[in-house]
């Protein structure tokens, strides 16, 4: 698919199959997030894929490794906006108790509309997904303002969300941010 892609996130399932998630800034009609299943053995976390140069400054000029190459993936899916709501960036996927959680940032990263939302799937890492709601938002007294662009950590039996939010008092256009960690709870 010829789309803008950003904020890639690699997820490895229990069977060692790997999935690459990305967002599109929500500028395409009908979808804002995509997922591609990598062919077995295509991505080794201990080695750079063939063609990627260690000099990252030149990588974008030479483009030796076209991430969208059909030969790299065995399955691709654009996740429709009927499954996710207001996708902007920063997809993050994790699995807990057989449920796949697809989390992502929504709104403008410069305002109080920036937030983290999520959807779940019991069928697999490619969905279909069911939208579930918001995880992090600007609170009423704005001590938490514009939270987003997160990751989820699993440490023992606990889950934590690591994200940034605008400095308080609020920074102009959200350019100054704080890194935060909060414990996640599940209903």
What is each model feature region?
Residues 1-187:
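Carbohydrate-active catalytic/glycan-binding domains of CAZyme proteins
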């Amino acid at each position: 698919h010829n789309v803008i892609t950003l904020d890639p996130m690699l997820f490895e399932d229990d069977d060692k199959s790997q999935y690459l998630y990305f967002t599109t800034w929500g500028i395409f009609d009908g979808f804002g997030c995509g997922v591609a299943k990598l062919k077995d053995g295509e991505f080794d976390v201990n080695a750079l894929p063939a063609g990627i140069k260690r000099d990252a400054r030149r990588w974008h000029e030479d483009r030796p490794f076209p991430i969208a190459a059909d030969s790299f993936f065995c399955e691709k899916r654009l996740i429709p906006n009927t499954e996710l709501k207001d996708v902007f960036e920063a997809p993050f996927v994790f699995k807990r108790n057989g449920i796949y959680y697809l989390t992502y940032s929504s709104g403008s990263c410069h305002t109080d509309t920036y937030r983290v939302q999520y959807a779940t799937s019991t069928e697999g890492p490619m969905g279909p997904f069911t939208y579930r709601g918001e995880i992090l938002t600007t609170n009423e007294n704005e001590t938490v303002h514009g939270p987003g662009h997160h990751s989820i950590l699993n440490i023992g039996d606990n889950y934590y969300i690591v994200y940034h939010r605008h400095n308080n008092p609020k920074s102009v256009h959200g350019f100054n941010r704080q890194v935060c960690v909060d414990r996640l709870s599940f209903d």
